[in-house]
């Protein structure tokens, strides 16, 4: 169940440097501790390992996510444009997604992120379509790409 279900994710993170794995797992705990009733959706994609939290089991309802790349982690908000970034710390100029680059705990403005998470979660709940069966507190592996580009592999 949920936060304790970490085996698949740890396996997906094996090719990444220790500091990147540590940041990803610390950020994961950070979100799980704040939103234990949500679901973690994991994607072992071609370019990166990504996982996010959703009040449902649907990717469209994800309110925050972590993307693990070669030398850092992106911690972001799928609809980050929908709420204010008072401190102007979020990166991104697309139509929806905003994020922080995180390399260490010291890089991460945890108290400010808690405010952003609250807004992102409320936004996701407000946009959520009715579901027949509500799934809560689960870790769900949504996809595993058969071919991956990871640190240390030939491009």
Regions found by a protein language model. Give the residues of each.
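Charge-dense, helix-prone N-terminal extensions
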Residues: 1-155
């Amino acid at each position: 169940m949920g936060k304790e279900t970490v085996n698949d994710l740890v396996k997906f993170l094996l090719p990444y440097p220790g500091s990147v794995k540590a940041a990803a797992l610390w950020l994961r705990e950070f979100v799980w501790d704040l939103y234990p009733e949500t679901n973690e959706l994991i994607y072992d994609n071609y370019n990166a390992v990504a996982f996010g939290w959703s009040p449902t089991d649907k990717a469209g309802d994800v309110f925050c996510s972590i993307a693990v790349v070669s030398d850092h982690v992106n911690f972001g908000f799928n609809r980050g444009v929908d709420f204010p970034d008072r401190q102007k710390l979020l990166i991104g100029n697309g139509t929806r997604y905003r994020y922080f680059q995180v390399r260490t705990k010291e890089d991460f403005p945890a108290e400010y992120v808690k405010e952003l998470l609250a807004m992102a979660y409320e936004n996701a709940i407000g946009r959520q379509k009715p579901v027949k069966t509500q799934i809560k507190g689960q870790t769900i592996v949504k996809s595993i790409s058969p071919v991956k580009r990871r640190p240390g592999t030939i491009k």
